[in-house]
Structure formats: structure tokens, C-alpha cells
């Protein structure tokens, strides 16, 4: 599958403030290495998204993430979610979806921390998602969500603890393809080890 696979899809990638990103890796990685890791994974996710989708947007409050997104050719949306918001990630995703919906009839939320996701996997997931109004790919643990797809305009992101079950309960169809790279998000030292086993060249 080539770039034509999903040119009517808009991809949303959300990135936290880099100062607080990937805090669970702090015991094994100091802050400068965590920042390099986050930016490297973001750049990889953008490249994979562009391989199969027509529009890629990064939403973040962080100026360094903005620079990385712009350099990679992605649209940047400033995340103006107020401090103390009870659901900041999903609020940011809803904001980005509202801005992309006019130009992209189909939407995808792709996690920013997927260092071994491949263009082939992403294109296959997009193709599978076309058969459903709303669908998702669970992470390798089966509890989180690596990607959320909408082909009817109603994204309804429910990321957070047990997001896979929350998306199932909300009616989203679980896509069950053999996509180990797409399912391998990195939050913990164990995740880093698995990503390396799958061939990730991590920028540490």
C-alpha cells in the first residue's frame, strides 16, 4: 500500500510538555535523554503518518515539539488546554479534531511514542479502519490504545487509564491485525527493551 491508501485521513499526534514527558523512564534515563527520545519518536511517527495519510497535525503546548513538527512538515496546533483541566489529553485531541474535520473527513489519533511502527502497518490499519465508523488498535498490553480511527466525524477520544476498554465500551471496533510495531508504545524501561528487541534505533 502506498501513499494513496489514506490521503483522505487526517492524523493527529499529541505531545505533552517535554519537561514532564515520559516521567516513568526517569529512573533509567535523565531528562535530556528523555527529551531526545520523545522528539525522535515524534519525528518517526510523523514520517510514518505522512507515508499513508494526507494531513498530519501535531498538537502540543511545547515550543520544542512545535519546532520538530514544523521541520518534519506537519501542521502544528498549539494546545491551549488550561492548567488543571480534568482531562487534558482528550480535550487537546477534541480541539485538534475540530480543526481538522473540515479538510479531513476521516481522522486518526496516532500515539507519538511508537518507535517501531512501520508505514506498512499503519497503511494496513487505515485500510482496516475504513470498514467501521470508529475503531481502534490496542497496545501490546491490551489495555492502552495505540491508534483511534473515525470515518464518520465522531472521534470521541477516551485515552487514559484502561483506554482500550473505554473505547470498546463506547462502541469502537477493535482492529486485530498483526502489527507489533504499531502496538509497541514506550512508557517504561520494559517498553524500551521490547522496542529495542523489535529493532528500534532509539535516539538516546
Swiss-Prot record:
InterPro entries, per the entry: CofC, Nucleotide-diphossugar_trans
Keyword Transferase appears in the UniProt entry: yes
EC numbers, comma separated: 2.7.7.105
Positions bound to phosphoenolpyruvate: 145, 160, 163
Leading EC class: transferase
Example of a GO MF term: GTP binding
Biological pathway: Cofactor biosynthesis; coenzyme F420 biosynthesis
Keywords tagged on the record: GTP-binding, Nucleotide-binding, Nucleotidyltransferase, Transferase
Purpose of the protein: Guanylyltransferase that catalyzes the activation of phosphoenolpyruvate (PEP) as enolpyruvoyl-2-diphospho-5'-guanosine, via the condensation of PEP with GTP. It is involved in the biosynthesis of coenzyme F420, a hydride carrier cofactor.
Name listed for the protein in its UniProt record: Phosphoenolpyruvate guanylyltransferase
Source species of the chain: Mycobacteroides abscessus (strain ATCC 19977 / DSM 44196 / CCUG 20993 / CIP 104536 / JCM 13569 / NCTC 13031 / TMC 1543 / L948) (Mycobacterium abscessus)
Gene: fbiD
